[in-house]
């Protein structure tokens, strides 16, 4: 039997040590509770009860028979008209129809090599300019060659006419 009180004493000592550690933690974190260790929520509840004692009795759903209580009765609350607010919110929530022009090039399926053509297009522009210049130069050379042959043909025909007139 002597062991039982010693075990209880040890448990009480451990409980006191835990309380001290918790108190030290509360002080460290800045929480301030009552010294008797009651939690803060209990303190707030007790303070609320004190304030509640000083408030007047309000009767909302109870129809009293006593004249004194009838004076304390709260009138029926009228519901607030929310139809206008709801209509405004519904109108604000309606999405405005967005009409965009549809680009058929974006909708049509593309050929498998479209990206290659896009990449090569810049290089082809440079080559196209060179090609046009080369074609123009070839045409000029032919015209010069034809002018020379035309001039010789004209000279030849004039020479024959001169011979014929002799």
From Swiss-Prot:
N-acetylmethionine modified-residue sites: 1
Protein name: Coiled-coil domain-containing protein 12
Disordered as annotated region, ranges: 21-55, 146-166
Site of covalent link Glycyl lysine isopeptide (Lys-Gly) (interchain with G-Cter in SUMO2): 94
Keywords from the named record: Acetylation, Coiled coil, Isopeptide bond, Phosphoprotein, Ubl conjugation
Modified residues (Phosphoserine): 149, 165
Skewed-composition ranges (Basic and acidic residues): 21-53
N6-acetyllysine PTM sites in chain numbering: 53
InterPro entries documented for this protein: mRNA_splic_Cwf18-like (IPR013169)
Coiled coil: 8-28, 115-144
